[in-house]
Amino acid sequence: MTRTDGDQWDIVSSVGFTALMVSSFRALETTRTEPLIRDEYARAFVEASGEPRLTEALAAGTPESEWDTATVYLVNHLAVRTKYFDEFFAAATGSGIQQVVILAAGLDSRVYRLPWPDGTVVYELDQPKVLEFKDHVLREEHAVPLAERREVAVDLRDDWIAALRTAGFDATKPTAWLAEGLLAYLPGAAQDALFENITAHSAPGSFLATEWRRRQATAGQWQDAVNKLKPEFIKDISIGSLIYDDERQDPIEWLREHGWQVDTANRLEQAAAYGRPAPSEHSDVTSLWSDAYFITATR
């Protein structure tokens, strides 16, 4: 799954497969007695993909008490991230925002599972084949969006702002932007361009959320960490080959320098606050997250 310039993917290949893995862990979280989040569509996405490793893992129905440490770690990791950004949207829409942009939306189902104020429009941007798969599954599930959903099939390394405008985006209105689980999959120049475009098209009152590790890990470090954390059913997947570890600006500093009011939440501290602390068995891996932050910003 090595990256190349201009590479494309569907839901079972390259970066698309990571969205499917995220869905599998959200599906597992949803089966818990006291889940942090509930995503009733996550299982449907995995099952519809036909991807044997993930579908078999869900079909096994292994009770939470028998999950291995790696599964617990990853399910917790995704549940904490999902809940944090769910709360971000609650705060943004609570301020009166009715325009939402989810970048690299993947199999995000927030438009179907979160309460949205009347009149909210949610734009979902991702690769064409990913959105095609997602739309098919949601139709099969007879899913009803709780806000107006507009899909924008575009590569975020291309002129995605033009595609967003064509879909009806209004830069004069405040916007809630989400870049969840995205930055590591962009080259440094594309990340910089992403924040430049967001800033240039954010009216006063806009919100932004993303995540960042202030001490960037190399692709090799990531692969070592992931290898220790991967459950048996995805041991052969090379996540490290999908990320970019080239030089880039720290978005926390960049956003502050460009007029955003920035707040951060340490990822490990947030996990503990939600009652999902990192397992002590992987202290060396956990250290990679010790300077990882959720970022929320307003302007």
Curated annotation (Swiss-Prot):
Cross-referenced InterPro entries: Ppm1/Ppm2/Tcmp, SAM-dependent_MTases_sf, SAM_mthyl_Trfase_ML2640-like
GO molecular function: methyltransferase activity
GO biological process: methylation
Domain of life from the UniProt record: Bacteria
The UniProt record lists the keyword Methyltransferase: yes
Keywords noted in UniProt: Methyltransferase, S-adenosyl-L-methionine, Transferase
Keyword Electron transport attributed: no
Positions bound to S-adenosyl-L-methionine: D126, D155, L156
Disulfide feature: none
Entry EC number(s): 2.1.1.-
Function: Exhibits S-adenosyl-L-methionine-dependent methyltransferase activity.
Family, per entry: Belongs to the UPF0677 family.
Classification via NCBIfam families: mthyl_TIGR00027
Name of this protein: Putative S-adenosyl-L-methionine-dependent methyltransferase MAB_0027c
Species in which this protein is naturally found: Mycobacteroides abscessus (strain ATCC 19977 / DSM 44196 / CCUG 20993 / CIP 104536 / JCM 13569 / NCTC 13031 / TMC 1543 / L948)
Upper taxonomic lineage: Bacteria, Bacillati, Actinomycetota, Actinomycetes, Mycobacteriales
